[in-house]
């Protein structure tokens, strides 16, 4: 597999090198590697606390390299492309076993009519590619730092990834307002089972409508999205209700500090849409269950000592919405999650920076195991530091 990927990569680079004079083509990327300490108390009888010290990559920002380019094809009209890969710099692994895991998209851009994007693209409620609206635009730690430093994806379920077979339309910017429309005909074609068919109700699809508004120090993002779930083993073969979520976020730059605030309402979110911490043994990994609830985040960045201080507080309340499997085996339950993160980034040069951070995440789970009722309050602590280089 790796040999095939290497051959494909070499061919792609050779092709782009030959065409570089005809279009504006750029190679770019970043490498983020550091050290990490975690302590996890699962608050479960018979489950030992876990303490570990390890090297990790992509702690503050996911590692990547990519190719992007544009070409003028007429008055006010351009064609463009974006190919973006993600990898582990601690072990050299390829994320998700995909050559271009983060983005593989082609774009038609018109000054008058907006932009059309086709291919594997960031969902609107993500920070991926040219189509993601969330990420670092709306939270100081983007999706997260490390494993337990709370960012959006650990308190807001679903949507923080690219999707396959995606079409996105971005309107022209009008008085600071831009509209975004998106539809994925099959969210994960690579991981799909043989019986899943693109565009059919046998596979997961997704639609989203978003809007952004920017005026001076104010930036606002709103996204309404829904996963059209296919029939899965997770729901015993039943066709689960489609999820629905509404997310709203805003930032305000005061100059001496930048304030971030965001919130989300969600319903019918299957358990797999939650980025739960397995070591914490929270109940959000329960099978055959969907959830509804709310999430809130409040954060800030402050220039200090030549760098930037970051802080973020996140909270989520998720309660069982629907139960699709009646079994004595599966464990699930309502869960509250709260987390706090504090970090500092210091630039060493135009390309390099050093960062440090610490965070704590705590779940309060009222679990239901049909043979027994129980609850748990797992908690995790994390301290990390690393170096990041852009090119």
Put a short name on every predicted segment.
Residues 29-37, 83-85, 120, 181-183, ...:
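Transmembrane beta-barrel strands of outer-membrane/channel proteins
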Residues 61-65, 102-106, 163-167, 205-209, ...:
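Hydrophobic, lipid-facing positions within transmembrane beta-strands of outer-membrane proteins
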Residues 208-342:
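Detector for outer-membrane/organellar transmembrane beta-barrel domains
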Residues 23-37, 52-188, 203, 212-219:
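Outer membrane beta-barrel
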Residues 77-79, 112-116, 176-179, 217-222, ...:
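Repeated loop/turn-to-beta-strand initiation elements of outer-membrane beta-barrel proteins
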Residues 377-391:
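Outer-membrane beta-barrel "beta-signal"
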Residues 1-22:
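Gram-negative bacterial Sec-dependent N-terminal signal peptides
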Residues 69-71, 108-110, 171-172, 213-215, ...:
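Residue-level signature of outer-membrane beta-barrel architecture
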